[in-house]
Regions:
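Bacterial Sec-dependent N-terminal signal peptides
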Residues: 1-36
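Terminal presequence/propeptide segments associated with secretion/organelle targeting
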Residues: 29-728
């Protein structure tokens, strides 16, 4: 892609929107067992309902999902589009994970009001804190629109033409929903590798306020050390409230808004659970690749995962060093570090689990069975004889460039924040209404509040070195030629000059830059000019593998469909795609390896053990007042039958990223806790379900209520809840 063409096409806002949305993606990851699967609530078949009842489900299916009357799905929300949550009061209280609300807590924190360290409690509605960029989403209904979507395609279309036709129809169907009712959002998603399409109709609420957050010593206890691990003792929860207008309709933030009154409130149980108790999760899992070919898995391991491991490890080390030195930096960088390190450790664990559990061998065995079935089935042999060899060849063709793009995305698009600022500016729609332009600018200006130039410069130098060391010279963008010819190969000198001459390194400079310049002169800023150079290289690499990628998309779709035809008698569930899903199973212990037996719950006793074992480690530092409260043993009605305070528990529910904050219900639809993590031994779970070792980690609702009432002294929140206590 020619640089001049990029600059000349700057005024085509539609084109730039399409181009940069792809780049900016980098800124922002058959039921063979009764407990496997992320099921669509609106499409539960008889086999699934039967399996749930056999395991202990007591409530009828129409109480799980109904479009005619309030049901359990009406209490479950998508929280911000990246997590899940559950509505627990008539006045719109929402429980979600502490790590889901972490960014909001951080934005309200300062050195003087360190809510990350000390926690936050709103003792009145007036003290609840607004979060302008946060929303919750309720699912109203789902509808199969496969036939309508596929009518837009013809057999003679290329893969690119087919994709464009399908995307256009999906948008059209979704837009029809909001045109009929402006309070609704319609989204069509692809299922089963693009073989089916379903419409989901939602209602969004944009006024969501922070009500309660425990200190990070509770909500993040164990931090990176314990992340993805069991046994766990993390009180990973916080509380928000949904607000609406006086007619109970969605509304942007206003002091005149009132608490939202939901269709359905999830009841809470204090009865707890036992080994083998039924448990189901409801939430919004992000994405899985259960039907991906072995070739795709191998590419993921060596490309995206390895790039994330290598590059983020370097970047995070710089961040963490500075965060440990200064409280102001700790607060500024807390949220971005938390998000980055979460997926970094996930990638490490995923690659390790794929190897240890021999996932590739299992996939190849399934593919061998498919090959034989195709050869023995005349109707399939005619169409798919060369399917597997085509997959292998096309993945091989794009191997090196795909790997380079993974490192490119991590090193530059998701690396120095100055690059992110430049790309955001290039994506501004300057022809929009003034109100929208101002909103775009304000959103960018807000990012500077959590930005440190000195740290970002060090990150940039490290990213330049890391990328050069990991890819072939053919994949180096033009900036490396500049570094070598004008700066003698010295990355530090290049970065110093770049930041010294760019005006967008500070909010004041950005305002001055945008007020003075027109789009004609924007490329005069070296950071913006660099952004264009990176886009050119990005699309150059993308074009190199375009043909192979189109072929892979088609082959993977046909591979998915062929597997379902081969096992037509099996009950298949679709991969996760950020739509509401149900998973179910039982609470239970597990043995990950010889000599290790893990119980199905933990208690506060383990908190004291870890504090002692990890003395001096900030990941396990807990305030004396918290330890004193836990040591008192005054757990009241929140204690189990032995008088212990349970903290976390595990089930074999099938979850993934996005399920964080998902409600964990018993067979009566009563809240047991919130899902917040998976376990280390089954980090390959996005690719294959491992029934013997895969576990969903949840925080016990009784521990949550204990912390709210006893530590937060927020009994007014407890009084709002619908608590079922059969022990009385």
């Amino acid at each position: 892609m020619n640089r001049n063409k990029v600059i000349n096409s700057f005024f085509s806002r539609k084109r730039w929107g399409e181009v940069l949305c792809l780049v900016l993606l980098f800124l922002y990851p058959a039921s063979l067992h009764a407990d496997e699967g992320m099921w669509m609530l609106g499409n539960l078949n008889k086999e699934t309902r039967k399996a749930m009842k056999e395991l202990g489900l007591q409530m009828p299916a129409d109480r799980l999902y109904s479009t005619k009357r309030p049901s359990l799905k009406d209490a479950v929300v998508s929280f911000g589009g990246f997590c899940s949550g559950v509505v627990v009061s008539e006045d719109g209280l929402v429980f979600t994970n502490h790590h889901c609300g972490f960014s909001s807590i951080q934005q309200h924190s300062s050195v003087d009001h360190d809510y990350l360290k000390d926690g936050f409690v709103a003792h009145s509605r007036e003290e609840e804190l607004p979060n302008p960029e946060l929303y919750v989403r309720f699912l109203l209904r789902t509808e199969d629109v496969t036939r309508r979507v596929l009518k837009a395609t013809t057999p003679g279309m290329t893969e690119a033409e087919r994709g464009l036709a399908i995307d256009s129809m999906m948008i059209l169907i979704g837009d029809e929903v909001s045109k009929k009712d402006s309070t609704l959002v319609g989204i069509v998603d692809a299922y089963y590798g693009g073989n089916e399409f379903w419409l989901s109709v939602y209602r969004d609420f944009n006024d969501v306020r922070l009500v309660f957050a425990p200190p990070s010593s509770i909500g993040k206890f164990g931090w990176d050390t314990d992340n993805w691990m069991w046994p766990r003792h993390t009180g990973d929860f916080c509380v928000f409230r949904i607000y609406a207008d006086k007619e109970n309709r969605p509304a942007d933030y206003s002091p005149d808004n009132v608490p939202y009154h939901p269709e359905y409130v999830a009841p809470i149980t204090l009865d707890g659970y036992k080994e083998g108790s039924f448990c189901m999760t409801l939430g919004y899992p992000g994405s899985t690749e259960r039907y991906l070919s072995s070739f795709g898995i191998e590419e993921m391991m060596n490309g995206m995962n390895q790039a994330m491991i290598d590059v983020r490890g370097v970047k995070q080390a710089i961040w963490k060093r500075e965060m440990d030195r200064r409280d102001s930096i700790r607060i500024k960088y807390a949220s971005k570090y938390d998000e980055s390190s979460n997926y970094w450790k996930n990638s490490i664990g995923t690659n390790k689990a794929i190897r240890k559990l021999k996932v590739l061998d299992k996939k190849r065995q399934a593919e061998d069975a498919l090959r034989k079935w195709i050869q023995k089935t005349p109707s399939e042999r005619e169409k798919l004889l060369h399917l597997m060899s085509s997959l292998e060849l096309n993945y091989k063709d794009r191997k090196e460039v795909n790997r380079a793009m993974a490192y490119f995305g991590e090193s530059f698009i998701n690396g120095p924040e100055l690059v992110q600022f430049a790309l955001t500016i290039l994506n501004f729609d300057f022809e929009a209404e003034q109100k929208q332009v101002v909103a775009q600018l304000q959103k960018l200006l807000d990012k500077y509040a959590n930005y440190d130039v000195t740290i970002d410069k060090e990150v940039f130098v490290a990213m330049l070195k890391e990328y050069r060391s990991k890819v072939d010279q053919a994949y180096l963008p033009d900036l490396y030629q500049t570094i070598d010819t004008l700066y003698g190969g010295n990355e530090q000198m290049y970065v110093d000059s770049l930041y010294a001459h760019s005006e967008i390194t500070s909010p004041r400079g950005l305002k001055r830059f945008l007020e003075r310049d027109t789009t004609f002169h924007m490329v005069d800023d070296p950071a913006v000019s660099l952004g264009i150079d990176l886009i050119v290289k990005f699309f150059d690499m993308r074009s190199q593998m375009a043909e192979a990628s189109d072929n892979i998309e088609k082959d993977e779709r046909e591979f998915n469909a062929a597997m379902r035809r081969m096992y037509a008698d099996r009950n298949f569930y679709p991969d996760a795609n950020s739509t509401m899903r149900l998973s179910f199973g039982t609470i239970g212990s597990y043995s990950p390896y010889d000599g290790a037996d893990y119980d199905y719950y933990t208690t506060v006793k383990g908190i004291f053990e870890k504090v002692k074992e990890h003395s001096g480690d900030p990941d396990f530092a807990v305030q004396p007042e918290v330890l004193s409260l836990l040591a008192s043993g005054d757990f009241g009605r929140y204690a189990d039958e032995k008088g212990d305070m349970n903290v976390c528990f595990i089930s074999n529910n099938d979850i993934t990223g996005g399920n964080s904050g998902s409600a964990m219900f018993n067979g009566n639809g009563e809240l047991l806790g919130l899902a917040f993590d998976g376990n280390w031994e089954a980090m390959s779970s996005d690719i294959v379900f491992e029934p013997e070792v895969q576990r969903c980690i949840g925080v016990d609702v009784r521990y949550m209520l204990f912390i709210i009432e006893k530590f937060g002294k927020a009994s007014q929140l407890i009084q709002e809840l619908k608590i079922e206590d059969r022990k009385k």
